[in-house]
Amino acid sequence: FNASQIRDIHRSLSSSQSGKRFFTTEWEVLRDREYLWIQKKGSSQLIPELIMEEVERTPSFVIPHDKHIACLDADLLNHPLTIRKWEKGDKFVPLGMNGKKKVSDYLTDKKFSLFQKENQYVVCSGEDIVWLVNERSDHRYRITDSTQRILLIQIKKDGQ
């Protein structure tokens, strides 16, 4: 960044305008609320690889309370499951809620930065979002007393 750009970035910190972006040939800076997010320009994440394990529901099964693991009723899912970045207008029913919520509203409520929003993935069964990856499962696919088969999904990490 040159001196003029640095002054502009500094000036943006004293204004109430969030979402301002600054670019060089290699870098991008985003002013989001009271933070500056810096990212290499054009850097794109690879589509995450899913690890899926189907298990029978037994009395000893304990539902993992971990947002990094989706725990879904396997009998309610339409295969194949797909993974993609969320799109404008996408909706899901966050676990524990009854009504649909726009993914964009959910991410805003959780105070995701613009960079984080741009890199958020969803797992879909048919047209339905069943998991906002590493955030929240869809309530309609939750484990209930009548669930017999459970599908556990997580994102493959390096070395897994």
Predicted segments — roles?
Residues 1-160:
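AMP-forming adenylation/ATP pyrophosphatase catalytic core
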